[in-house]
């Protein structure tokens, strides 16, 4: 991308290496000036849409503040709580301060809370209603613990880099699926206790209990070089995500647009650089894309220690620094005095923060910030119960629906009254301890000696208990009178020749701070082939924090069933047993593409590394544009092991009766001009097309099907997900599934007009079971 971003100062900061005279090493960031267009000034929040009352109150509040009090709202401070970050109180105006804490799959570092299914698990459920329920119940736990801001959900990384260490925190590699689920998640968190959600009655005693923070804005796709570092006395900058305008809008910005449209009150900017400008002081992305184009009314917070500039960051659109700042404080008021920053910018920063507090009604009967977040749970503290019996059904259902059955031969599953089960693999058992601890970062491909139910880093969570697979299998065996043998240590275990089934448990670990060392693990694969060599009914379960390749053994005749179990949270074993024994029917679908071999992912397999003249300023060129995951496989004609959207069931579904109907709305190329609302031009959400199809359960077991709609848009990838509905269908019955498509769904980003544009020509419509199993095909024209 270096050749076409309009380099300014081409020769600035270039030196000739004596070790390699032919290589000109870039030694100053002035070389990159101008690659990310400047957008100033930072737009003031205007209280559009549902924010009007909150802004009215916030402006009146901020008008009473001293300059010092305004500044204090913009940066975290140390506290005697276990909150990840704290904004100080303003006692004279009855503002109690703010507690912000991880994570997007449940609270971390405290007690009396639940470990919820992770983002990738929710993504694999393909269930919008369940995503909202999960978010609501998580939100109530944060509320009870006095946490004002939930640091989640995550929609970046999107999953561009297959080995990305934090891909598991997000929902999917597809922007549409990720966007649909983040919309429901934001709604669930921020409306906890106020609104109603399908199949859930929300107690009225909680009033808009929580707010969320969507992260990480944007283009944050690898851990390698995510932060600047010093190696042998040499400073190396953060990696730069070099993203063109089209890919930015059609991939990386898409789910953030859905989050803003849902009303998210805050957004976290990311660590890395975007087009060679640090994300937390990138005026193009913060002022231009987020606050102007998307009409974002909330505030922008740094990731922890993610501030790299002082007044420049404030002018570029940053509103809050965590966990503290060394660059703001009195420097903000000094900047106003010397004219390098407008007083209105500080007012807007404070107003956005306070408006967000009012927007979720935290001025009314909210617990004291951090009341349930002790700094050290091993010291005497008040027991504040976050978890609730009301959440148990959602907790278990969420764990169940994120499992994806990808192989099931010889009628291996569901299990039919086995006399003897044999359990193998390090992932089968619970760990040797379960204590409340802080974040940990371990660079490993697997987690040995315990079942993997959540990933590593700041996105991990605290559990009320962990019901591991081996424990759950034994509980079921006790009820049924089944014998159970196990060896969860050996790589080549003995197998009783009369066993009915061998259950093998492995995992694929990932964590913040490191990109994954690979997509396979030799010891785990050897274990599987060793067991399969002795057992003709080997059922493999993989708890995977990301894509896991299975090509070395997937076609082994004795490997009869395989489940991608992802990261189910604390109900991991209970959920799995419900599926193994057929009390629940598998309904998860892959939110990513599983290749046959690592090389099929091409340049998207590994993170970018510092190299050549960019050794001090690592570059990650997103030169593939919009072609990641299944889009890339489709473009290159590569057959995957398991395609995006794939998943098996214990029943079967038939599709028929496709109907495509254009709604009576204008189909002019560009949307009509309108005042920007949350999420952008409101006309982007006009319904343009409806599609319906009949889905019949032709099997003998009740089940849930995920009907998926893909569009072939002219001048775009051959197929893109643009609709999905998860429907429960009793055996032998049929339902009519309807999809509603908006102007945005049918458009591509016009880089010249800087607008979403409908294409002239024939659109292809596909409906079916996955991105490559699409029995229904139709067409319409614009």
Swiss-Prot record:
InterPro entries: Cellulose_deg_GH3, Fn3-like, Glyco_hydro_3_C, Glyco_hydro_3_C_sf, Glyco_hydro_3_N, Glyco_hydro_3_N_sf, Glycoside_hydrolase_SF, Ig-like_fold
Keywords on record: Carbohydrate metabolism, Cellulose degradation, Glycoprotein, Glycosidase, Hydrolase, Polysaccharide degradation, Secreted, Signal
Subcellular localization: Secreted
Pathway annotation: Glycan metabolism; cellulose degradation
Cellular component GO terms held in the UniProt record: extracellular region
Enzyme class label: hydrolase
SUPFAM superfamilies documented for this protein: (Trans)glycosidases, Beta-D-glucan exohydrolase, C-terminal domain
Predominant subcellular localization, coarse grouping: secreted
Sites carrying sugar chains: 25, 46, 72, 275, 331, 338, 443, 449, 536, 558, 654, 664
E.C. number: 3.2.1.21
Reactions the enzyme catalyzes: Hydrolysis of terminal, non-reducing beta-D-glucosyl residues with release of beta-D-glucose
Active site: 303
Endpoints of the signal sequence: 1-19
GO molecular function, one term: beta-glucosidase activity
GO annotation (BP), single: cellulose catabolic process
Coiled-coil stretches noted in the UniProt entry, renumbered to this chain: none
Family: Belongs to the glycosyl hydrolase 3 family.
PANTHER family in the record: BETA-GLUCOSIDASE, BETA-GLUCOSIDASE M-RELATED
Function of the protein: Beta-glucosidases are one of a number of cellulolytic enzymes involved in the degradation of cellulosic biomass. Catalyzes the last step releasing glucose from the inhibitory cellobiose.
Protein name: Probable beta-glucosidase M
